[in-house]
């Protein structure tokens, strides 16, 4: 399992609770796994539409908001986990009102994970999941937005209005 460094300790502690029921051992090998991180850096993951949940965004989203259902990272046929009923209900009723989108922001200031995106009237439009500067001096970001907010042209970040462009993800949002 790959996870963001800011939540490794929390993830391992949670998983160890279940290890007693199975013949398994859970070990943190993140210090040994530097080649994987070099191969798929943060900007590559953003462009691939693969969110990294950080300590700032833990417990803010259900899996469908991060498009994990579209990437086949969720099984709706098996398993038992906290929040399963909410996740299954959203899947079977089709009631997902927020999804993750790939954005290009015309700024050189990289917003933090968990930062709010607002419109000029101060209404919250969404939340930054991950963001990185690109080669053109802009910022590419994954952000969870209301599905009704996808026609936006500008957002307010840190009290500064910034133009925004919705980019295509490498998978369909259905």
Each model region followed by its residue ranges:
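Anionic-ligand-binding alpha/beta catalytic cores of soluble enzymes and soluble regulatory domains
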Residues: 35-104
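Residue-level signal for inorganic ion chemistry
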Residues: 1, 83, 122
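Short, exposed beta-strand "edge-strand" segments with a Pro/Gly-rich flavor and a Y/T-containing core
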Residues: 1, 48-53, 139-145
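Hot-dog-fold acyl-thioester-processing enzymes
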Residues: 20, 77-78, 122
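Helix N-cap / beta->alpha transition motif
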Residues: 4, 32, 54, 146-148
């Amino acid at each position: 399992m790959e996870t963001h460094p800011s939540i490794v300790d929390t993830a391992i502690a949670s998983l160890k609770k279940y290890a007693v029921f199975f013949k398994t051992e859970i070990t943190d090998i993140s210090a040994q796994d530097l080649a994987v991180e070099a191969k798929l850096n943060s900007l590559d993951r953003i462009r691939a539409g693969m969110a990294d949940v950080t300590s700032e965004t833990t417990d803010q989203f259900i899996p469908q908001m991060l498009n994990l259902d579209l990437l086949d990272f969720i099984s709706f046929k098996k398993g038992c986990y906290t929040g399963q009923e909410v996740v299954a209900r959203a899947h079977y009723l089709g009631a997902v009102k927020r999804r993750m989108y790939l954005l290009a922001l015309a700024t050189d200031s990289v917003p933090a994970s968990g930062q709010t995106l607002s419109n000029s009237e101060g209404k919250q439009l969404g939340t930054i999941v991950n963001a990185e500067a690109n080669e053109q001096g802009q910022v590419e970001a994954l952000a969870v937005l209301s599905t009704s907010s996808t026609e936006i042209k500008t957002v307010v970040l840190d009290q500064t209005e910034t133009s925004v462009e919705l980019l295509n993800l490498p998978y369909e949002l259905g």
